[in-house]
Amino acid sequence: MAQVARETKVATQVAVMNEASKATRLLTEWIAAGVIGQVREAHNWSQRPYWPQGIERPKDPEPVPDGLDWDLWLGPAPARPYNHVYLPFVWRGWFDFGVGAIGDMGNYSFDTMFRALKLASPVRVDASSTPRFPETYPVGSLIHWEFPAREDRAPVTLHWYDGDLRPPRPAELEPDEHMSDVEDGEGMLLVGERGKILCGFEGQNARLIPAGRMKAFEPPPDDLPKSPGAYEEWIGAIRGGESPRASFEFEQKVVEAVLLGSIAVRMGTTLEWDAEHERIKRVAEGRAGDLEIANAQINPPRRAPWELA
């Protein structure tokens, strides 16, 4: 889709909204100004999933509800009898329909981190989790992406936690300080060579830790270009203006990382990624056939008549 958008010069936008937020812009300015030095680690944690995961396929079919075209709802996914465990909303936890917690929320927070840290394609992705199941994502998972040096930026490792998992509490926090957002229990932590930034899940309410450093902090100039707003960017692009910041071309790399993370969770190991050829080139501790199984998940087969030409 990103390639077609480039070739046709069609305006595109992914509705993540972070690209237009003050929080993302300020975090990007702090990192660019070297407030905490070169960032070597980024941590991002979510309370999700709050839908069922780590379950088996139900054995007993149920009557299809009136008004639901079950075959149409399945689309390209393999056929199966109807059961309420698949919809609505709860489809997120199933391999054939969703991408688990990382797919549900990673597109938002990763948008912020990809901008602030100038990230592109990872070279390696590793995952571990609670017990794995044949068709659903686990209850909790840890995913780690290794990104190489970019322009003037050092290599960085991005760590994701879901299922109520989170990184160790920073020693810089006072006992009465909250590590996670008090409303949703989620957060983001950027670790640099000269300090740490703690913020909400998508980069909001950023602050330096310890608190004493934040009190003495003199922010860098707020001089990055400001967005008129995500909707305004979209309308302007339709009318022939600049491409939206959250274009398919930019978000392609975000989605690539998220999907690689989900594949690593399903495989339960480390994957080495060849971004140029868009393929997994090695599966750590792989059994015979694991590399083929992992690569098949990049472009899974589609049920007729939903094939793509």
List each language-model region with its residue ranges.
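Active-site Tyr-X1-5-Lys
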Residues: 4, 26-30
